[in-house]
């Protein structure tokens, strides 16, 4: 995937989504809508940007992370989610699911190109809605990589239930749980399909996993807190310092994109 951007000074750049690198473009280089690495053609690209032999080497030999989208379904309907039906140009929460055979093929290809420790990230939608697939793909991946692979996913926490604890702990998953800072704000933004609040259920799930294995909870569960406005900071700070499930936790902060 390529993305063309222009700076405030009028300089043009090309972002290569495959390699996560940025190139400076000459003024006469044009990219048509929907262009890809294949449609642009490597010789054509090399006329306008720095030759990417180093990029090709990275793609072929230095794979480190594989992201697997398990499902487009989600059990929440966050008011700012770009996959909501209100955003007509984005995908919706469709019933599209992963092809397991294709996923295993891609994992094997990834294994052949990963020269060092590897990372598998399960993505959604809400990945825990496809927990059987997580189990199958995790076991398959471990049969290839042995001890060289680590697993992670981001979840809203609604389906982080007791029946999953043993498997997640045994396979040393790194789990990021997304919250909206504090209860009142969270429940106004992160609602269920039926329009109900979600904070109390998520806190209950976190409390259960902390009681089940406090070491895993402390070391392997990270909180991502969405900040919707600067005014939220005081309330978020209070929640972090008074909620026993959040005190001392690693918390990352993010801001939703505003139109």
Task: Give short role names for the model-derived ranges.
Residues 104-121, 130-255:
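Radical SAM/AdoMet-radical enzyme domain recognition
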Residues 94-98, 126, 194:
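Pocket-edge positions in alpha/beta enzyme catalytic cores
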Residues 57-60, 71, 80, 112-113, ...:
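Short, charge-rich binding segments
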Residues 70, 124-125:
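Short acidic donor-binding/metal-coordinating loop in glycosyltransferase active sites
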Residues 2-67:
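N-terminal [4Fe-4S]-dependent radical SAM core
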Residues 85-90, 184, 258-259:
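A short, flexible beta-alpha/helix-coil linker loop
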Residues 61, 65-101:
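Canonical Radical SAM [4Fe-4S] cluster-binding loop centered on the CxxxCxxC motif
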């Amino acid at each position: 995937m390529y993305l063309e951007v222009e700076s405030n000074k009028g300089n043009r750049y090309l972002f290569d989504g495959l390699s996560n690198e940025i190139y400076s473009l000459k003024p006469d280089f044009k990219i048509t809508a929907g262009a890809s690495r294949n449609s642009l053609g490597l010789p054509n690209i090399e006329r306008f940007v720095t030759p990417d032999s180093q990029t090709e080497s990275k793609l072929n030999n230095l794979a480190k992370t594989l992201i697997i989208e398990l499902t487009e379904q989600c059990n929440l309907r966050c008011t700012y989610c770009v996959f909501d039906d209100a955003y007509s140009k984005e995908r919706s929460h469709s019933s599209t699911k992963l092809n397991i055979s294709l996923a295993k093929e891609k994992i094997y290809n990834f294994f052949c190109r990963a020269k060092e420790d590897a990372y598998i990230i399960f993505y959604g939608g809400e990945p825990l809605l496809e927990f059987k697939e997580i189990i199958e793909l995790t076991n398959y991946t471990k049969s290839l990589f042995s001890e060289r692979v680590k697993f992670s996913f981001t979840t809203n926490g609604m389906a982080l239930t007791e029946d999953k604890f043993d498997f997640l702990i045994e396979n040393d998953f790194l789990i990021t749980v997304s919250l909206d800072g504090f209860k009142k704000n969270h429940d106004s933004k992160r609602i269920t399909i039926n329009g109900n609040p979600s904070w109390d259920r998520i806190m209950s799930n976190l409390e259960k996993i902390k009681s089940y294995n406090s070491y895993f909870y402390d070391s392997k569960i990270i909180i991502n807190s969405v900040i919707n406005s600067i005014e939220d900071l005081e309330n978020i700070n209070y929640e972090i310092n008074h909620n026993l499930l959040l005190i001392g936790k690693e918390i990352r902060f993010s801001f939703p994109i505003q139109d």
